[in-house]
Amino acid sequence: MGAREILEVSKPRIVLLLVITAVTTMYAGDALSAGEPGPDLWDYAHLMAAGALASAGSSALNHYYDRDIDPKMRRTARRPIPSGRIGENIVLAYGLAISSAAVVYAYFLLNAPTAFFIALGIFSYVIIYTAWLKRTNRSNIVIGGIAGSAASWAGWTAATGTLDLLGFLIGFLVFVWTPSHFWCLAMKIREDYEAAGVPMLPVVIGMQRTSKYILGNTLLLLPYSLALYAFGMGLVYLVIAVASGGLMLVYHYKLTKTPTPDFAWKAYKVTAPYLTIIFAAVALDAAFHYPFPFPF
């Protein structure tokens, strides 16, 4: 056991994605609201620290809970617990400690609403998704997507102290995006989930129908993302949302024609950066905020 194993159970790429989501939303919340004074650099640092602790702790608890099924899946069989590189009780203690620390840290150094949404993210990922829905319901990832939304809502409330309609809608975008993203991955590794007895959508309804669900979800995601203009976003956001969402739509349409693991992986690689791009667009739009020149 060492730092490498602790880093691995923390899932640093997911930590980075959620911290980017929270920080860009914090910036947008500050820029688009009339509240004064806004957050300073220390507030951003505190949000990054609390978000990283929460995400890493949740990931560690996910590793702990899934220790019985990870050996059955090629993708996860070499994780630290099933490979014997770290003790399961160490991972449990680490996950509980830093998850709890994240909520306390946010409460005292940011504000109560931010601490609440960080706690919501931890609870929805660890309890609702990992411990309950993942092994029992084919819609598991749909409901579990609320964990990603919570990161955005935490960022907004860290800036404003409250969650208004625009802040809620921006965060809910993560929830809408999650099925399109994760079902592509599930199509790629369907055999793993089947071997582990996890009822992911491709296991339950097959590859062809899952590809149609992905396309249907993306057909909801694209207009939803564009509709945010009507609630306060501007031209910079709109242009980037059209381009990135349009590319996803093309690949997900092609996936319905070629519902194979290999093409699902290509679609996944297009879908994966969407969230980072769209939240960068939120931040850029907040910085420049050019209103769209046509009345809606």
From Swiss-Prot:
Pathway(s) per entry: Porphyrin-containing compound metabolism; heme O biosynthesis; heme O from protoheme: step 1/1
UniProt entry tagged with the keyword Ion transport: no
Gene3D superfamilies: UbiA prenyltransferase (1.10.357.140)
Cellular component terms (Gene Ontology): plasma membrane
GO MF annotations, alphabetized: protoheme IX farnesyltransferase activity
Membrane topology category: Multi-pass membrane protein
E.C. designation(s): 2.5.1.141
Membrane-spanning parts: 14-34, 41-61, 86-106, 108-128, 141-161, 165-185, 230-250, 274-294
Keywords of the record: Cell membrane, Heme biosynthesis, Membrane, Transferase, Transmembrane, Transmembrane helix
Catalytic reaction annotation: heme b + (2E,6E)-farnesyl diphosphate + H2O = Fe(II)-heme o + diphosphate
Gene Ontology biological-process entries: heme O biosynthetic process
Pfam families named among the record's database cross-references: UbiA
Enzyme class: transferase
Location in or out of the cell: Cell membrane
CDD domains for the chain: PT_UbiA_Cox10
Family of the protein in this entry: Belongs to the UbiA prenyltransferase family. Protoheme IX farnesyltransferase subfamily.
Protein task: Converts heme B (protoheme IX) to heme O by substitution of the vinyl group on carbon 2 of heme B porphyrin ring with a hydroxyethyl farnesyl side group.
Miscellaneous notes: Carbon 2 of the heme B porphyrin ring is defined according to the Fischer nomenclature.
Identification of the protein by name: Protoheme IX farnesyltransferase 1
UniProt source species: Cenarchaeum symbiosum (strain A)
Gene that produces this protein: ctaB1
